[in-house]
Design a protein with these regions (language model features):
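N-terminal hydrophobic/helix-forming segments and targeting peptides
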Residues: 1-344
Length: 344
């Protein structure tokens, strides 16, 4: 398909970099919502915003059922559970699923409800190796580790004067782009969302060719299990989320994964087969895979027994929910499969 030659991988990466640098732990997604809205208004893209703050880009004839594509822009993060004024430390609880081990030494930002931001580092409570001989034996958890806040307190001030229980915490993304590899936190799922934003320009320029409506849904509650409960009447759903790379899976960072089954059960056979055939027809690098411990935006829709076909695809991502990595070839393959489905 000629249109696929217009896809530029480096431009996708540029968009992803912008997204991963916007703090958006689930429940604190206003800034990324604003980014998506401003982009739509600048490009003349029709959009709506849900009560929860999700953003939907719409293309093509609105009265002809088509395809609903979904990715999520909420990310892993944390919430403050305790402010220790004696030790000047802040304890946190996770937003989303990850072990404490995955954020040891991580630069974090505390976002207060008064609009202030404070930089901190997640480290063991007694972190000096020269005084704590048990550090080598320690298994990190959220009791023996906490946030060390970079805030100079004046006489009479307490840490709890500035930071409160319930404040949100975002994790620094640590973005790097080296030799085709994209290293960053939050590639799950801002890599897919970045593809949506990038492809929106191509689709907008070719909107007159669309024979049915196409929607890009940017969800903001996926990491806490709140997926999509419904789609517009008659639309099917293709979820675009990270493909798993690791032991026991077939995924590759340089391919698009087409998932046959995850923890929710099998995805729609006909729609999944259609995507596989499109990948082969257009010579798109892909892997058919099964994800053993995985849920997506489509999981809620499947459990609701909706009469909707659901499929799942996405670029392979290594070290999921940690310091993740994908490759520009996998991103391009995913973008190509989406575009091939829309215009194929």
């Amino acid at each position: 398909m000629k249109l696929l030659s217009e896809i530029k991988g480096d431009k996708i990466v540029e968009t992803i970099e912008k997204l991963v640098k916007i703090p958006s732990p689930t429940g604190f997604t206003g800034k990324v919502k604003d980014f998506l809205v401003k982009n739509a208004e600048k490009k003349g893209i029709s959009y709506t915003v849900t009560k929860k703050g999700a953003v939907i880009y719409s293309f093509g004839p609105k009265d002809v059922p088509g395809m609903f594509f979904a990715a999520h822009v909420d990310a892993l993060g944390a919430i403050v559970t305790d402010v220790d004024d004696d030790e000047n430390r802040v304890k946190i609880t996770t937003v989303g699923g990850y072990p404490a081990l995955y954020i040891i030494g991580e630069i974090c930002t505390i976002h207060t409800r008064k609009g202030k931001e404070y930089v901190s580092t997640f480290i063991p409570n007694n972190p000096a190796v020269h005084v704590n001989s048990k550090l080598k034996e320690m298994v990190p958890d959220f009791e023996n580790c906490s946030l060390r806040v970079d805030l100079t307190l004046k006489k009479g001030e307490k840490l709890s004067d500035f930071i409160s229980v319930g404040d949100f915490v975002s994790l620094d993304c640590g973005f790097r782009y080296v030799d085709g590899y994209v290293n960053s936190r939050h590639l799950d799922d801002k890599a897919s969302a970045g593809i949506f934003v990038y492809l929106s320009d191509i689709i907008k320029k070719n909107e007159s060719k669309l024979k049915s409506r196409i929607s890009f849904f940017f969800n903001v509650t996926e990491e806490t299990g709140q997926g999509i409960a419904a789609t517009p009447q008659g639309d099917d759903l293709i979820v675009v989320d990270m493909g798993v790379v690791g032991g026991g899976t077939a995924g590759s960072e340089k391919c698009v994964s087409i998932c046959a089954k995850d923890s929710s059960g099998p995805y729609n056979y006909d729609l999944t087969t259609e995507l596989i055939n499109l990948a082969e027809k257009n010579k798109i690098a892909y892997k058919t895979d099964v994800f053993p411990f995985y849920g997506s935006d489509g999981s809620a829709l499947l459990r609701s027994c909706s009469d909707t076909r659901v499929a799942l695809i996405g670029q392979g991502v290594d070290a999921s929910h940690g310091y993740e990595r994908t490759h520009v070839e996998g991103l391009t393959a995913t973008a190509s499969l989406i575009l091939a489905y829309i215009f194929g």
